[in-house]
Amino acid sequence: MQTFRIIQPTPALKPFIRYYWILQDSTSGIVSQRTLPTGCMSLVFHRGERLKVTNRDELQPQSFICGQESGYSDVASTGDIEMIVAVFQPHAAKIFFCMPVTLLRDRNVAVADIENPALRDLAHRVEDSENHDICIELIENYFYKCLMYGTPYHLPRLAEVVRHINNSTQTNIRALSNIACLSEKQFSRIFSENIGTTPKDFMRIVRLQRTLSVMQHNEGIGFAQLSYECGYTDQSHMIKEFKLFSGYTPKEYIARYSPVSDYFTF
């Protein structure tokens, strides 16, 4: 049996946290899934058995920070699954970890390996808590305590940049740096330190997620129209990019999965 819940953060945390999701699965046999880059970092707590990342032949840590990803991962269950995940707004994760999040790119960094006693204590308490509601309350209390130390002055400008990327199929570094009121060099550095990847790569990930969203809501759309709506140069460009991020062409992907955009849906 599988249950999946999306939980919205309290209003005060919404500028920093997109949502929480909780997955429980006691299905007999191995459950496997291919995950694609979402453009958002996350904080993951396993209360059940850990997942195995099969294409890297490694087990996920018990609790970990998932950095920005540049490609797909194949994950498989090793027993009963019980996961609680906090998904950050693209520009907000650095507030809670006090490090340049570029260091976390393409990595699952165990909470146990981070010099942050409060975060390690949170992981233990989430693991031992009676129910999911208590877990979410503990996680939100931790986030509130982090925010007591203030937020970076450039956070609003990065939020505006992300909003522009979300709403535009065509933009460039110069336009984004102008929105942020920074030089292109300053902008690229601050963007990467706070979002965990370069502006160019982030825009490519958002374009991938937009492609999934259009496919999700327009079953049977032609690939030429899809590439036009999502801002690719042409159909061959879209197919190349999609395969780079997912391991499949769009046609191969929809033959295996129902396309869903985590970024634009939740």
Q: Model-predicted segments: where are they?
A:
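Long, low-complexity intrinsically disordered regions
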Residues: 188-193, 197-203
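A secondary-structure capping/hinge motif
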Residues: 194-197, 240-253
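Short Lys/Arg-enriched helix C-cap and helix-to-coil transition segments
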Residues: 203-204, 254-255
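Alpha-helical bundle regulatory/interaction domains
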Residues: 1-159, 163-174, 180-184, 198, ...
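Pre-recognition alpha-helix immediately N-terminal to the DNA-recognition helix
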Residues: 160-161, 207-210
